[in-house]
């Protein structure tokens, strides 16, 4: 009986109900968008980390993220081979280079370059295995087909069988390079596109770099060993001029940079908070006005013997109804926003069950907070004051 009563009170003023639902929908969409882009930022930042088939990684202690790696001596990586539990090690070189759009005259754009050792297939991504041998040719590269279109119609032209030769430049030194295949990695906030090549080709482009100084050292362990024990041994064995991380620690290292060392994480969290505030304020105004208009009826029920709990529950039911009815269209609009954001930015943004449940919980919370604030007038209302 209570639920219909709560609904009838809300539906009696349809315009007011629509305003309340609009506030919840707006807040829900804002929260979905802020959380979606924030999580896409973190996930896109670790595309490379997830694609590397290693159990541990060496980096310089001065490195802060993938976009700001500091080189260290390859000798440290080779020292790891003194442990029998280590199956192989592989150097990885990374850097940015200017890419010339072959379709647009004199249009250059920064692109992220990954140089790998072709002796070991330690990189898992679509398109790499079938093009592995092609990378042994001088001045060849694989192009990330998920790169932004500002780099040119590379994917479409290559799939049509066209030969793609363009220029890349580093420190004023331009080199012609041929795209011999496509692979899939994905863009991030730090990279609009990616190239994958052999490390000899990498060094031909980055002529100021030496093969003796690497950016990431990939370490693969022998199967069926105690990985944590070996990691502890390696940390004790290696000098302090390198840092050794497990794969999960390597992923967390990158995510922590974007979450704590940049303003991006704070900005998106602030957006979530502001979305909550907007929802609370709108729902509070609606519920407070509703309570004020029906105050005489409420105190009459009090005089008839109804407890405060009954009346408070009536208001909370209205808050819950507003939350549920507002969340459903907010969820659907969030799905639509995710679709277009992924389509036009190529960020890995998608609706997840965890996020959907979390935002629903936030929606209920904001409505209940608004309801709890709005019932103060009702809680202390005295029939003698009204009549």
Predicted segments with their positions:
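C-terminal membrane-exit region of the final transmembrane helix in multipass inner-membrane proteins
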Residues: 2, 349, 354-387
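Peri-transmembrane interface segments
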Residues: 230-281, 289-293, 309, 313-314
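Transmembrane alpha-helical interface segments in multi-pass membrane proteins
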Residues: 275, 288, 292, 296-342, ...
């Amino acid at each position: 009986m209570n639920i219909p009563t709560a609904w009838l009170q809300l539906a009696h003023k349809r315009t007011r109900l629509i305003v309340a639902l609009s506030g919840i929908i707006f807040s829900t969409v804002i929260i979905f968008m802020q959380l979606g882009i924030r999580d896409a930022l973190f996930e896109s930042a670790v595309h490379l980390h997830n694609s590397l088939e290693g159990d541990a990684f060496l980096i310089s202690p001065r490195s802060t993220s993938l976009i700001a790696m500091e080189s260290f001596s390859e000798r440290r990586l080779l020292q790891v081979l003194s442990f029998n539990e280590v199956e192989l090690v592989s150097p990885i070189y990374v850097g940015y280079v200017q890419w010339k759009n072959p379709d647009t005259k004199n249009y250059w754009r920064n692109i992220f370059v990954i140089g790998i050792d072709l002796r070991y297939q330690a990189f898992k991504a679509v398109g790499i295995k079938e093009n592995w041998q092609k990378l042994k040719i001088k001045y060849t590269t694989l192009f990330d087909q998920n790169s932004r279109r500002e780099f040119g119609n590379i994917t479409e032209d290559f799939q049509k069988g066209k030969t793609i030769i363009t220029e890349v430049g580093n420190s004023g030194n331009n080199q012609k390079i041929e795209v011999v295949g496509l692979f899939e990695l994905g863009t991030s906030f730090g990279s609009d596109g990616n190239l994958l090549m052999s490390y000899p080709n990498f060094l031909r482009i980055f002529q100021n770099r030496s093969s003796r100084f690497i950016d990431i050292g990939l370490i693969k362990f022998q199967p069926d060993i105690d990985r944590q024990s070996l990691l502890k041994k390696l940390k004790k064995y290696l000098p302090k001029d390198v840092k050794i991380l497990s794969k999960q620690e390597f992923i967390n290292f990158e995510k922590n940079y974007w979450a704590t060392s940049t303003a991006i994480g704070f900005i998106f969290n602030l957006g979530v908070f502001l979305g909550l505030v907007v929802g609370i304020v709108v729902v509070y105004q609606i519920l407070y006005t509703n309570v004020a208009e029906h105050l005489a009826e409420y105190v009459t029920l009090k005089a008839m013997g109804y407890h405060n709990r009954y009346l408070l529950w009536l208001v909370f039911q209205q808050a819950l109804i507003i939350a549920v009815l507002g969340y459903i269209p907010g969820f659907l609009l969030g799905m639509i926003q995710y679709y277009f954001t992924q389509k036009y930015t190529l960020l890995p943004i998608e609706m997840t069950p965890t996020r959907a449940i979390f935002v629903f919980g936030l929606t209920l919370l904001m409505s209940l907070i608004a309801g709890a604030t709005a019932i103060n007038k009702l809680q202390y209302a005295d029939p003698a004051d009204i009549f």
